[in-house]
Amino acid sequence: MLNIAALRQQQIPLAAEPRSPVPFHILMKPIGPACNLACRYCYYPQDETPVNKMDDARLEQFIRRYIAAQPAGAREINFVWQGGEPLLAGLSFYKKALALQARYAPDGVTISNSLQTNGTLINDAWCRLFREHGFIIGLGLEGNEALQDYHRPDKRGRSTWSAALRGIDLLHQHQVDFNLLVVVHNEMAAHAAAIYVRLVSLGARYLQFQPLMSEGAALREGYQLSADNWGRFMVGIWRQWRKRCDRGRVFVINIEQAWAQYFTHTSGSCVHSARCGSNLVMESDGQLYACDHLINTEHRLGRLDEQTLAAAVDASVQLPFGQQKSLRRECQTCSVKMVCQGGCPAHLNAAGNNRLCGGYYRFFSDILAPLRPFSRDLNGLKAWRAAFVGTAHTA
């Protein structure tokens, strides 16, 4: 049972947690890099990094202060839980988190939770928790069984495909909303159509594709996604999605976010925002970092108990990588800059260029073609929607 009174006595004194002047999110890693899988491309050096589960005192401090530091007028506060494998924290951990959220949430503010998992530990008890509290689940999966078993084995080198599919089936049975997250690497480039069909056959309505980061174990294993293969794969997904007339039935987040950004001038992804730095990461020991893919000394912002969250957000926003991500000359004259914005700073090569640039250009050029005749405002959005009602195959 969570002892709120005892936790309050352990709090580091704060006269008041000041509000951040800008919206921000913190991705929480309650068990750090701990995981039951041994993915070949994982960016965490698991053999070298100590693993510690977040204790109750730090969990309470984080939730209390994260809620208090949100900008004035915030109507929804989203908690994102990731790992490693965050389910290793245990059911009781998330029940405590939910109780704390309910205690500290101001009147009129909605609390939501998202969790990214490999799916292999999901059971009925987890699904009941997810369903009752409206969790959105992101489930990492390779494109097919052969890819999954080679690239995402368990700690003993055994297959994880069946366990992941069992988790997906349980999410369906309990009517838990989820999306499939697919890490794209060179081996997949020629098989986009088949991979798309297989993923949709699993009943997935939301798909998200993420380029493989070449860091950590990914470098040691020789992974290096090329710009050509990234573009080739994503165009293949786009064309298969159109061919099957899946608009409105299957939501490919990479496409939907770019389309929304074209008309609204705002991005739902830090990767393609005009600047980044407002999506922080906190490890189980309270260390804050500017970016999930830049967990290193250079981008370390300090501990939760060393500063206010508003100060941490301000420091993150001011880091050069966040300020200058789309200021390169080639970006300024690019015809897809409005939805690309230079991509992720973690993808820059030694010359300061995004190593996926050509792939983004090819993909965005294709998917923006149907939108070009329409003005980039809400009137254009309304006109575009009206023009393509019932003609999903042309969009």
Curated annotation (Swiss-Prot):
Q: What is this protein called?
A: Serine-type anaerobic sulfatase-maturating enzyme
Impact after mutating G83A: Drastic reduction in AtsA activity. Abolition of binding to AtsA. No binding to SAM
* Ranges for domain Radical SAM core: 18-249
Where this protein primarily resides, as one coarse class? cytoplasm
Q: Write out the GO cellular component annotations.
A: cytoplasm
Q: In which pathway does it act?
A: Protein modification; sulfatase oxidation
What result is annotated for mutating C291A?
Exhibits reduced solubility and drastically reduced activity
Q: Where is the active site?
A: D292
Q: How is its activity regulated?
A: Activity is inhibited by iron chelators.
Q: What is the effect of changing E85A?
A: Drastic reduction in AtsA activity. Abolition of binding to AtsA. No binding to SAM
A molecular function annotated in GO for this UniProt entry is: metal ion binding
Residues engaged in binding S-adenosyl-L-methionine: Y41, G84, R152
> Pfam families recorded for this chain?
Radical_SAM
Which residues are [4Fe-4S] cluster 2-binding? C270, C276, C291, C344
Report the InterPro entries cross-referenced here.
4Fe4S-binding_SPASM_dom, Aldolase_TIM, rSAM, SPASM_anSME, Sulphatase_maturase_rSAM
Q: What is its EC number?
A: 1.1.98.7
